[in-house]
Each structure stands twice: as C-alpha cells, then as structure tokens.
C-alpha cells in the first residue's frame, strides 16, 4: 500500500505544487516543492518493481467501469527520474535568471503544470488520459514560451510552437 501512495504522491505533487505556488508565489517555496517531488520520484524509481501497474476507478457508465490506469516500466522510471532532476535544475537556474521579474510566480505555476503534465503523459496507461496530458503539455509549452508575452519574439516563438504542436496532434 505504501508504494501505491508514493506513486499517487509523485503523480499529484506537481499539480498540488502549481496550486500552492499560485497562492504563495515565492521562488524558494517553489524550488522546495520541486525538491520534494524530485526526492519522491527518485525514491519511487529506486524502490518500485520494474513493471509497476496500478488502476484507480474513474467512473462507471452503463455497468462498465472505466479506470485511470498507470504503468511505470523500467524506461518510464528512468525518464521520470530525469524529469525530476531536470525540473529541479530548471527551477534553480530560473531563481537567479528571473530574480527581478515581477511575474516569477506565474512562471513557476506554468513550470509545475508542465512537469505535472509530463509526468502524467509518461506514466498513464489510458489513451484518454494520454491524450489529455498530451494537450496539457502543448498548452504549458505555449505558456512557458510566451511567458514574456510583451516581447514580439516570445509571441512569435509561442505561435510557432503552437502550430508545430498542432501538426504533432494530427499525427497522434
């Protein structure tokens, strides 16, 4: 049961962090939450079986049960560890790079949402959740790229990324 709870924590912590950072937009608080996520993710990756599967009941429709199912095989666990490490490094770098930006809290919210979307995309075993996570990753990419929306270059780059993501969506 402990491993299931840890997995649920790894899955939900970035989303909860986005909400908490939206309420308390302090860089050190955001970095601390990412550190907790990183440690939890690394601990999960080192203690979970190589082929970890879990399903949570989502809803019943006409006597049929639809589950939110997740699967963490060895490659997914490795990539989860990399996502945790890279997101922590990005947060550390961002603290000094964006130190004087008044909108740093918004940036950290977008970053936590992006990490949550990536984690969900990586670990889901459900096509519906996969598609939703795919769309969320695209939306968060757009928001992060257009963070400095006052600059023309950022706006143009965000539009370009949005269009490229749409082509990827068509292929999906």
Kindly label every feature range from the protein language model.
Residues 12, 16-19, 85, 89, ...:
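Generic alpha-helical transmembrane segments of integral inner-membrane proteins
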Residues 107-172:
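Alpha-helical multi-pass transmembrane bundles of energy-transducing inner-membrane proteins
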Residues 11, 70-71, 84, 123, ...:
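Short conserved micro-motifs on helix faces and helix-strand junctions that flank
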Residues 1-6, 16-109:
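Transmembrane helix-loop-helix hairpins at membrane boundaries of multipass inner-membrane proteins
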Residues 14-17, 69, 88, 115, ...:
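Bulky hydrophobic/aromatic packing residues
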Residues 14-28, 144-155:
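Cytoplasmic juxtamembrane interface segments
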Residues 9, 37, 50-53, 125-128, ...:
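Generic detection of intrinsically disordered/low-complexity segments and helix-coil linkers/edges
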């Amino acid at each position: 049961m402990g491993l299931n709870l840890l997995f649920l924590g790894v899955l939900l912590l970035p989303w909860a962090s986005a909400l908490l950072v939206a309420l308390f937009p302090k860089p050190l608080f955001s970095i601390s939450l990412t550190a907790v996520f990183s440690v939890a993710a690394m601990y999960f990756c080192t203690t979970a079986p190589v082929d970890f599967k879990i399903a949570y009941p989502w809803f019943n429709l006409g006597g049929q049960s639809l589950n939110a199912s997740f699967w963490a095989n060895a490659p997914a666990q490795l990539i989860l560890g990399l996502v945790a490490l890279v997101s922590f490094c990005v947060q550390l770098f961002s603290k000094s790079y964006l130190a004087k930006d008044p909108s740093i809290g918004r940036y950290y919210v977008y970053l936590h949402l992006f990490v949550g979307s990536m984690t969900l995309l990586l670990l889901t075993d459900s096509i519906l959740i996969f598609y939703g996570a795919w769309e969320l990753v695209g939306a968060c990419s757009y928001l992060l790229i257009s963070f400095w929306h006052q600059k023309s270059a950022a706006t143009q780059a965000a539009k370009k990324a949005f269009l490229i993501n749409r082509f990827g969506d068509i292929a999906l």
